[in-house]
Amino acid sequence: VGLVDGVIEVFKPIAQSKSISLELNSEIEFVNVIIDIEMIKSVVRNLISNAIKFSHKDTVVMVHVKVQDITNENATGEGNGKEVLVTVSDKGCGIKKEDQGKLLNEATHFTTFGTNSEEGSGLGLLLCKDFVSKNHGRLWFTSEEGVGSNFNFTIPIK
């Protein structure tokens, strides 16, 4: 969790400059996870950066971290039956329903624009998905246009 704290502290001034609050809600204090720390930092940085980019002024970007049991739905065959779940939620512009299937698909490429006309290509998310997969985790999202998005990833606890 200290890893997530550090990334949040780096992004707080950026969020504040856009009148966005960046907050952490953690249900854990310490988890011993054998992972590529720089990879995890990259994933968290990308998800927070995107959330800030696509959030409206005077909203909150929330980072939630917890440990959960691995269920059949999200089983990877790795770890001890537990995984860390990180969720980055925003109340931004959301993703159009017709674009949601394209976002994590390597075969498609499209350009999006944030709330301040900042450009996004989705390539960072593809890299995040690849990084997480290589660590036996998953990355997925839910989104509603005009409401916001939740980007989630898991890493098994070893």
Which residues make up each language-model segment?
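Short alpha-helical Gxxx[C/S/T] motif in the catalytic ATP-binding
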Residues: E119, G124, C128
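Short helix-loop "hinge" at the ATP-lid/N-box region of the Bergerat-fold HATPase_c
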Residues: A51-I52
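Conserved catalytic submotifs in the C-terminal HATPase_c
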Residues: Q16, S21-V31, Q68
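Glycine-rich G1-box
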Residues: P13, C93-G94
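Glycine-rich ATP-lid/hinge loop adjacent to the conserved G-boxes
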Residues: T108-E119
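Short conserved segment of the HATPase_c
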Residues: I95-H109
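Glycine-rich ATP-binding loops of the HATPase_c
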Residues: H136-T142
